[in-house]
Structure formats: C-alpha cells, structure tokens
C-alpha cells in the first residue's frame, strides 16, 4: 500500500516542483526543446530536482545571440519566481519578488541557477555594450543592472501569465511521487520522473503558448 505523503513533505515538494516546472514551462514558451523533469524529496526535506532544457539552437547573428541569452536568463530566473507562486487556485497568482531574490541568492537553495545568471549576464553585457571601457566599473555595473532589471521584469510577466500552468504541472509532478524502497535501508525518499514524452502528452503542456523574449 502506498504510504501517504506527510503534509510538510508535500508542501516542500510542491514548492520545488513549481520551481522545476517554472523552468520547464517558460523554456517551452520561449521555444526551447525540453526533456524530463525529476524530483526527489527525503523525509528530512532534502531534495534533488531537475528540468532538462535543450540549449542547442542555430544562431547566425549578434541579435539572435542576444535574444538567446535573454531567453536563457528568463528561464533561469523563472525557477525561483515560480517557487514563490501560491499553490491554491486564486483569481491571479503573483510572484513574491523578494522571496524569489532570496532563493536565487542561495538563501533557499538555487545557487546553481544564480551562478549561471551571473556568467550569462556578463556575456550579454559584453555583446550589448561593446564600446564600454573595461576599466569603467561604474558604467559596467549600471549596464549589468539595466540588463538584470529588464530581464527580471519580463520573467515576472511571463511567470504570472503562465502561473496556473506552472502550478498545475507542479501538482501533477508531486502527485506522481512514490516512496522508494531501498535494500537494507528504511524507505525515506519520495521520487518521480516525468519523461519528455509523458509531459508532451499532457494537455496543459500542449496548450503552452509561444511567447517572445521581449514584451
């Protein structure tokens, strides 16, 4: 008989599921190919999770490169923002921006996302402002802030527009979790893998709209 997931574990699992489905849904909306989404949560609330995003794209101009980098930044920001969405159905689900910022900055576990963000935004700044003096630290800081603020705002718009899809798929992911029996050890881990093929058969995935990086 399936052991019922304790409420505290389910609540934690839903937050992480929303994080991964935020990456997944926003990536698909921006034209990235996607694969599996996985989630493991232990009884003591440790977790491992991932959403497979396929980054191969044909890029033949600087403008296409800038668009690709902005799209990648939006996908990275989307995880932390989606993690803050309320689980319950409401007229409009809103991102908690301060909590999303704390998640990205490593206080709540998305350090890898932010490490990629830091690197990609420098690359985007190098391309967007090629004439800036490398010694002008104040100018570079201002340019990085302009890029980050613009992409952050666009991510918020996209995540809030797709919030119901993200949280619905997050619930599907958690509903599929089963406790894993491990030989010689107590069963203490709930796990799920939704393959790319399984996800693409789901109606909410098929209904994800195609969106632009720029509003």
Positions of the model-derived regions?
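Soluble catalytic regions of large protease machineries
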Residues: 2-215
